[in-house]
Design a protein with these regions (language model features):
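Extracytoplasmic ligand-binding site segments that recognize negatively charged/polar headgroups
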Residues: 23-170
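Short beta-strand->loop
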Residues: 37-49, 73, 198-210, 221-222
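Paired acidic/hydrophobic, glycine-rich loop segments that form the ligand-binding mouth/hinge
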Residues: 14-21, 164, 181-186, 201-202
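Periplasmic-binding protein-like
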Residues: 145-155, 196-220
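Early extracytoplasmic/lumenal segment of secretory-pathway proteins
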Residues: 1-32
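A ligand-binding cleft/hinge motif common to bilobed small-molecule-binding domains
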Residues: 25-29, 184-199
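C-terminal capping/gating helix-and-loop segments adjacent to ligand/active sites or protein-protein/ligand interfaces
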Residues: 243-309
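A bilobed periplasmic-binding-protein/Venus flytrap-type ligand-binding module shared by bacterial periplasmic
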Residues: 82-89, 124-125, 213-227, 246-250
Length: 309
């Protein structure tokens, strides 16, 4: 892992005061190796705005805490990754991952070229549809990983996938050009592809989704250099409705703070009626996705990581 190598073998501690990465394992690895330090959240005035999912015992609580229970991360974006689809071309809305593997879209389907999200998403589908016995899609056994991989290999051999997209721009281009009609992808890819003119929608899959977040962490080197107070000031920005409203409206990321609707209503010059409607619909869609029981949180370090790789 590049982040780990940079801080434990390279010169990361000298170069960086803060680091951002996925919550769901990275915060533990960085904390175990003393690359980051516990946070004094009383110095982050907007911490009170943090959504309840991060309260102790709730679904995302562990993604900002180390194994000792200390808070070491500040979340600033999150999402439940789903499927983008070209509604006018496929003939309606889609609410199941089954479409990604349906022969009617043979040669027009795409997935991410990344073993983590692609294997987890496929595992969620196979588990919830009863096609494979899987205990935890985010932490599969070797045999479970093998079964998921074999399913994808069989699909690839049949010509189901147009490609496996690499990077944000590639994901956007495939949808915007209509070279691909259904794709597992990040929501911002669907948002930008739609802005380019294609009838791209982002669905809620009845089987579930891979959920994730990104968190900011204060490095040991940053604290030693006296940057702790500056870090907390920056975190206030990331936990402000100003930031949450804009990342939601422009990219589709889930705000990590309360008060976004109130902020939007109080700033009509920044958010016209159409933008307000988009924000309201996206918030509803996100609530619907997060309510699906088959959701599985991203795990950067499954026990059988080598099998995934």
């Amino acid at each position: 892992d590049q982040a780990i190598q940079k801080f434990f073998v390279g010169d990361g501690q000298k170069l960086y005061d803060a680091i951002t990465d996925n919550g769901g394992g990275q915060e533990d690895a960085m904390s175990d190796n003393k690359a980051i330090v516990p946070l004094d959240v009383s110095k982050i005035k907007n911490w009170k705005n943090l959504i309840s999912e991060y309260n102790e015992g709730n679904v995302a609580a562990n993604t900002i805490r180390n194994r000792k229970g200390e808070i070491v991360g500040v979340p600033y974006i999150s999402n439940a990754d789903s499927m983008a689809y070209n509604k006018s071309k496929v003939g309606g809305d889609i609410d199941t991952w089954d479409a990604l593997f349906d022969s009617q879209f043979k040669g027009y389907a795409a997935m991410q070229n990344d073993s983590g999200p692609t294997l987890t998403t496929t595992a969620v589908y196979l588990k919830e549809s009863g096609k494979q016995d899987i205990v935890n899609p985010s932490d599969m056994s070797k045999s479970e990983v093998k079964g998921v991989c074999q399913f994808l290999i069989d699909m690839k051999k049949k010509g189901q996938f147009r490609t496996f997209w690499d990077g944000f721009g590639n994901g956007v281009d495939l949808l915007a050009s209509e070279e691909v009609l259904v794709s597992s992808c990040w929501e911002p890819i669907a948002v930008i592809a739609a802005k380019k003119g294609a009838d791209i929608h982002y669905g809620t899959m009845k089987e579930g989704h891979q959920t994730w977040n990104n968190v900011w962490m204060l490095t040991k080197g940053g604290k030693q250099r006296g940057q702790e107070d500056n870090f907390y000031k920056l975190m206030d920005l990331y936990l402000s409705p100003w930031f949450g409203a804009r990342t939601l409206a422009n990219l589709g990321f889930t705000p990590q703070m309360t008060g976004v609707n109130e902020y939007v209503d109080a700033n009509p010059s920044d958010f016209d009626a159409n933008t307000k409607a988009v924000i309201a619909q996206r918030l509803k869609n996100k609530s619907d996705r997060m309510a699906v029981k088959g959701n599985s949180w991203q795990n950067l370090y499954p026990k059988e990581l080598r099998a995934y790789q």
